Amino acid sequence: MSVGVPNRPAPDGNQRAAEIEARIAESRRELAELYALRGHEAATADRPAIADFSTGAPSESVQPPSTHSRAKRLIRTGRDVLRHVWRSPTALFADVERYFARSKHQSQQWSNSTTGRVAVEERLQDVWPLNVEIRTGLAPTLNVLLPSLRKQDLTGGPNTALNLTYRLAARGVPVRYIATDQELDSDASFLHAHLRAVSGIDETVDDVQFISGRNRGRTLVLGADDVLCGTAWWTAQMIKEIQPRLRSQRFLYLIQDFEPAMYAWSTKQALALETYGLDFQGIICGRLLADFLASERVGRFCEPGFLDSCATFEPAVDPQRFAPRFDAMARRKKQLLFYARPQAPRNLFELGLVALKQAAAQGAFPPAEWELGFIGSDDELPTADLGGGVLIKSHPWRDYESYARLLQSADVGLSLMLSPHTSYPPLEMAACGATVVTNTFAVKTSARLRAISTNLLPVEPRVEDIVAGLLAAVERADQLPERFAGAMLDVPPDWDAALDPVLPRILEIWNACRGR
């Protein structure tokens, strides 16, 4: 099912293209009035600013009520041009109309607070199209769309995308990384070093670019022969709007989880599901996830032979970073780490916390012997009192190396995710020698998890089962030989072993997308 305004075909011929570009240029100043929402307040809310088309800068003020008639006229007469500029969902117009209708009756509230502006942006931010200009005669480039390239956001999933595509760059594919949701860090020089670190490639590859597409008033120039790569469902939706304007009608889609399940039955779930039916070549992280997509028969995965045409690789766990450390375990107190992300419902934060409280009530974590910690969140979580003097203290995310050192101090891990994907934290904890309580889901069965590592203790995602798993993990804390043996995971030992076998297939896909 397609959601939003139907795609218009790209104009045929230079004359038609010039006419449309002229219409867009003439309309931008008027459209700036329609979208004059305060950019710096949106940035404070950490959401993409709605930019002034005429200057490329965030607009400075919300339009006063005197502009309502003009705005209404622009909405009525500017839709065709808007579609050429944004190719945006119908919800865009409905929200803008609702914005002006509400502000007309509550102008004081809207002019003095960010409530309304943020509400509009919250509804649109995940499907806000990139502002691109397509030019002919440019060398083909692989454009990798990532939500963020900020240092604090480069964790497991984004790092896998960077690792994979940087290896393509090292094999001669020009690569441009586009951050769709965030500006780059003020000092983005670390990115080249980060790419070398996550890929294990010592030399810096020259033909690599980093740009931000967050400011939609700033035009991004793409070549007509470029190929796009989506790394999350909303980046695939952005690609859907650009693809008809490129020569290639197919894009690369790196799928690392079943993202529709991250949302209730909703617009976002519908949009995420829709991406599996687009014209893409799949790159799938993990056979578990590939099997789940095939079993659910979503989108193109119901087509005979489609799964076989995808490139599927198993995630690696870096043994240089994630391995047991004797000195970290030779301490007075044992440690439990809970991968706690309250902002991510699929990580079952509440279920895990209730289970920990019940396990503590059964005497699992005597305060004189155990320390408990939250990990996985960017922000510091409040200390949780489980009763009986048992506290869970927060370890906010700092960087990847600090995260690895922290895992090496764990005796027990609790890492839940209601997904067919294993996720990285349970594997990384297990590789560091911890006994990890993690949940099963669909094709992610107990047998398949235990085949990866005996340090994984799979349970059903029920409170009583998680409690039983925690009690068993605590009993195993002193069994160091068994824990060290379980640290040898049945996954690729490094990213060379994980990705090198599938790179030839991905290069074939790259060439096929370019019509070669």
Which positions does each model-derived feature cover?
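Conserved catalytic-core segment of nucleotide-activated headgroup transferases in glycan assembly
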Residues: T160, A290-R300, F306-G388, I392-Y400
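A charged, aromatic-enriched C-terminal amphipathic alpha-helix characteristic of glycosyltransferases
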Residues: P461, E475-G515
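Short alpha-helical donor nucleotide-sugar binding micro-motif in glycosyltransferases
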Residues: A404-A410
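Aromatic "clamp/platform" in nucleotide-sugar-dependent glycosyltransferases that forms part
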Residues: M417-L418
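Short hydrophobic beta-strand element within catalytic cores of glycosyltransferases
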Residues: T435-F441
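Active-site proximal beta-strand in glycosyltransferases
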Residues: C229, P244-A261, Y276, I283
